[in-house]
Amino acid sequence: MGRGAGGGTGIGGGGSYAKNPNLSTSEGREEQKRLLELSNMLSPLNNIKDPKVKAEIKEALESYSKEIGLPYEVQIIASDLAKGRLGATDGGGSITLNTKYFSKSAKNAEKELSDRMKAGKGVTTNKPLQSTVHHELAHNTYSKLSGAKKDAVGALYKKYMSDKKVKGWGSYSKKNAEEFYAEGIAKSMTGKSDSYTKALRKLTW
């Protein structure tokens, strides 16, 4: 989870940002259709064996496009990552999912991710595979937030860190403001929304 070094505009630094990410407008929705089509084309996921896992990834990409909005086209690949890392993004449109989880059967992958969640490491969700994809997509979105919005996320993060009554988040969200944002957006997609997830959504666009 989390971002590596890098940046740029879209795939390999040469992609295109969403011209209008506002999902409440017809222009914004049409733009998301274009970005989703490009993302699916760039993400054949040939090295993922179980079609159910592949379908979960594609569904996560589509639901994120419809609910949050892709900031640009995304290429999703599966490859080996360090032990314990579920995924990574370079901040420039490329997302890597760890084959240690995603190359397994859907049943085994979901069990391992669910066990991680039950151990208190990640947000509570009923779709752990999709939640991992949503988390990495949220890192890409965070990289495009304005400075003022990142400051607002930081302020919300400080409030969250002092909240002793919060439930369903897990330890990873406490790492820093960006991980808090990514976990919160993921939780808002397939978990139970709360005041923090709702506030993060309002800060997104």
Language-model features: where?
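Non-Sec secretion/translocation targeting segments of pathogen effectors
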Residues: M1-G14, A182
